[in-house]
Every structure is written in C-alpha cells, then in structure tokens.
Amino acid sequence: MKTPVSHFLTTISALLTIGIQPAAAQPFEAVGMRALGMGGAFVAVANDSSATWWNPAGLATGPFLDLALTRASGESGDALPASRTGLWSFSLGTPPLGVSYYRLRITDIRATSPTAPAEAGREDRAAGVGIRSLSVSQFGATVLHTITTGVSAGATVKYLRGTAHVRDLDGTDAAGAIADLLDEGDDLSGGDGEGAVDIDVGVLAAMGAVRVGVTARNLREPSFSGRRLERQVRAGAAFDAAAAGGLPLTVSLDVDLRRYAAATGDRRVVAFGGEHWVRPQRVALRGGARFNTAGEQDRTVTAGASVAVRAALFVDGYGAVGAKTGESGWGVAARVSF
C-alpha cells in the first residue's frame, strides 16, 4: 500500500517526464496579487482563486469561497529585446471547483538586424525592429481530486482564443522610444482568432506547517499564428508558521524545473517570498524576490499588501522593480474571501 509521500512523489515524477521544447512563453508572473507580491513564490502557497493559474490543487486548502477581479501590468523595456504583459482577470474558487477568465496581451519588440547589439540604441534600431503582440482570452474550469489525506491533485481545463499581430518598422519609426513602440504593439488590431483547448495540472501536499507543490502549465503547448505558449513546470515549498502555533507568517520558495523561452531571452526562475498578516484577516504585508538563472540573469524585487475594507472584502496590490532588463510591474485587485 502506497504512503501519502509515495503518492506525491509518483505524481511529481510523472510531471517531470513531460518534454519541453523552446518557444514563446506565457509567464507565470502575470497573475495573482498575493503571488506577485511574494516574488512569484506561490506554487505551494496557492490557496485563493489564483490557484486556477498557479497550482489547481491549491484550491483544496482554500476558503469556502474566494473571488477576485484583477488588473495588472508588467514590463521589461530598458533595451531590446523588450516586452510587456497586460492582464485583466476574473477568478473564483469554491472547493472542489473553480472557474476563471484571464485576458492577456503579450507584446514584444526586437531588432530585426541579426548584427544589432543586445542593448540597441536608437541609431541601431533604425535598421528595423519587429513588433509582435499576442492577445489571449482564457476560459478555465478547475476540478480537484483528493489522493489521500493532505495530498490533492487538480487540473484546469481551459479554452483559449488567441490572435497574433505582427508589424515591422524601420527608419525613424523604429527609432522611437521603447515605451512608445510597446504602446504601438498594444494597439495593433485585426487578424484572425484561433481557438485551442489546453490543460494545467498540479499536486499539493500539506502536512502540518509544511507545504510542497508542483505544477505544469500549457501541457498541449497551443500556438497562435506560430506563437506557441510554452509548457512550463515549477515546484515550490512553503512553511506556514501559524499552522505550527507561531506567527501568521508564511515563507516560500519556488524553482522552475525547466528553462523556457521568453521575449527577453531564456528564463529559469528561482523565487522566494513571505506573507505576514500583521492584523489577522485585516492587513497583510508581502515581500519577495526572483532571480533568472538563465539568459539575462535579471533580478526583481517585489512588495505587496492586502487591506480589508470590510469583513471578507480585500483590496490587494503589488509593485515590482528589477535590474538588468529593467523589469517593473504593478497590479491591483478587489477580492472577496471567506
């Protein structure tokens, strides 16, 4: 008879055998104000409705109901290649089910000349830049299954509708400010939408104060006009001091188990963070950092907070600032949780 630990390890092993191919990515660090305030170290923590994105199994440890409306934006734009991700989302979790809608706009620009330097200036960009923008609407349904006491598995089956937009610029048009070029990419319209069905899966083991999880996203790697949403696998661990009779403090660590291609280069992220409810169920503070161990090896520091404006109604927010690629981000959400 298998123990809970062996069940958990068997599931992890199955996820790790999934092959990865380099492609454009839909970033983990696009969704969830709590997650982003903690630097993106959330796979083992995910217990609100953003678990529909971060780790479907996390809903098993969540409240009776969690509902969030979110607006967020992230950008890496000091030099080429540069990118921006914008998000509007609705998510709802009420174990053992969840539903979600994520609307993302992923825009990137890069020099079209193969000889252009990585930190291309305006003169270098005058030779030409390519602008790519992918708008994706994702509708998801999340279901849970209890493997054994303290160990759950979850899956989000999702329908995606995506439209890719491409434009090449040269001369003075290409030499504009990077922020203006990203704005132009965000404004691209037209094109034919394409639909695809995909699935995210995850497992979570919660044993006392210790939580361990692993999740795999975009298993079928859908593509839209040649832009593929790359499969990603991430593992996380967390310690919940309150569950051990201590402070209402959670610390966490996440690690990408495979590198993946993003607009600004290859990524393989290590993230850590913490969440402290300085006034339980009223005020929470968060902080974290993440490091890219591949590609540009950029570093990003994040902070966030939640404030209850009335019982069970929270306003969540976060901000991020980074080095190397000039990454920055912000987000705000209204969340009902009880």
Where are these regions (language model features)?
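Residues that define the transmembrane beta-barrel architecture of outer-membrane proteins
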Residues: 50, 82-88, 93, 135-139, ...
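A gly/proline- and charged-residue-enriched helix-loop-helix capping module
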Residues: 102, 107-144
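Loop-centered beta-sheet repeat module
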Residues: 170-225
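Outer membrane beta-barrel transmembrane domains
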Residues: 204, 209-216, 223-338
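Extracellular loop and loop/strand-boundary signature of outer-membrane beta-barrel proteins
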Residues: 124-129, 183-190, 221-225, 259-260, ...
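Transmembrane beta-barrel domains of outer membrane proteins
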Residues: 50, 54-60, 89-93, 100, ...
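N-terminal, post-signal peptide beta-strand-biased segments of exported outer-membrane/organellar beta-barrel
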Residues: 21-106, 220, 292
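Flexible, surface-exposed loop regions and adjacent strand-edge segments
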Residues: 109-120, 169-178, 229-233, 305, ...
